[in-house]
Amino acid sequence: MKTHQKIIPTLWIPLTGILTVNLLLNACAQTTLKDAFKKDFLVGGALNQAAFTGQNATAAAIARAQFDTISPENDLKWEHIHPQPDQYDFSAADQFVEFGQKNGMFIVGHTLIWHWQTPKWVFQDDQGKPVSRDVLLTRMHNHISTVVGRYKGKIGAWDVVNEALNEDGSLRDSPWKKIIGEDYLLKAYQFAHEADPQAELYYNDYTLENASKRAGAIALIKKLQSQGVHIAGVGLQGHYKMDWPSPAVLSETIEAFSAAGVKVMITELDMDVLPAATWSQAAEVSMNFKLQAKLNPYTKGLPDNVQQTLAKRYADLFTVLVQHRDTVSRVTFWGVTDGDSWLNNWPVRGRTAYPLLFNRDGSPKPAFNAVIQTSKEPQTPQKPM
């Protein structure tokens, strides 16, 4: 407490600095997320550059006070860290890792192999034509060995492959698959393990709660396991709706992956309270819909009744997660405050979204208190309906 008290008399602190100090002091006085669930699983957030560099003092303060694990929102993705064939830019990633280390956090690397946010040059030659299998494998190996090797012993786990499946559970026909073949996944995990044998390796995807895609993911994991790959866990991204998935379906999903021999993480958690722009539950980044007033109804704030519904939805979710604490190892929110959320600009750019536990000013929402409360209640396993 003394370190915080020394800051208070500094009268020239800007408004954001005052808010940060208040957040830090409040965090000392109330139960934090990481303390509430310390016997259950890690709790964290995805940080953007403004958060881990301190430019967004509010987000940085919340992260320090509330989280014991962090993921980078964008700064370890290929287009950011390896924009040109002979150019790596580790400046932001190094700061992210330093932030995590200074605050004693478990650091997750996101992501090594994805079909989005990967530069075109990775898949093309100088004439813009697709490269050969051998060339792409070499580029994959060099990238993974360089990035994972740089943070060996610092980043504890990696989302090695992200979003490799279609909604029916089949392999997505990505450039990786088209050029290398289905064994691109095997190679990616082998290269990552070679670069850091101690790091945990994960598969990460959205809508794994849906039966067909879940079955495809389990089949993929079992195939890789049979080939000698040790996948430590699967990431359910957790871009959830107010009516999807049900607690029973989430419970069923966790149990299915547990039976496959992997632990489960919720890796990109948010809860969209806004009207759906599409029937799809998929968090497909390519989706883009025109801004309409009916899709953006809460520009002046979230009504109390919606706040309470959101709080109950989060409480129901965390009740299931705590019930499955033996399988669930981590819950990571995709952002820190509502103002940080990607849902302000996806799938409709320019909306006012409210998907997280903290308001734009950094104050906790009713959903925060509802989540904390679930850690204090007796839990009994929930049977799938």
Please report, for each region that a protein language model flagged, where it lies by residue.
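Substrate-binding cleft and catalytic face of glycoside hydrolase catalytic domains
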Residues: 65, 69-83, 92-209, 275
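Short, acidic/polar
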Residues: 50-65, 138-147, 213-224, 314-320
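Bacterial N-terminal signal peptides that target proteins for export
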Residues: 2-15
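Bacterial N-terminal signal peptides
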Residues: 12-26
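Structural preference for beta-strand elements that scaffold enzyme active sites
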Residues: 40-44, 69-71, 106-108, 155-159, ...
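Aromatic-rich peripheral "rim/lid" segments of glycoside hydrolase catalytic domains that contact
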Residues: 117-121, 129, 150, 159-182, ...
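Acidic-and-aromatic substrate-binding clefts and catalytic sites of carbohydrate-active enzymes
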Residues: 46-57, 78-91, 165-170, 207-216, ...
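Boundary/entry segment of secreted carbohydrate-active catalytic domains
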Residues: 30-69, 73
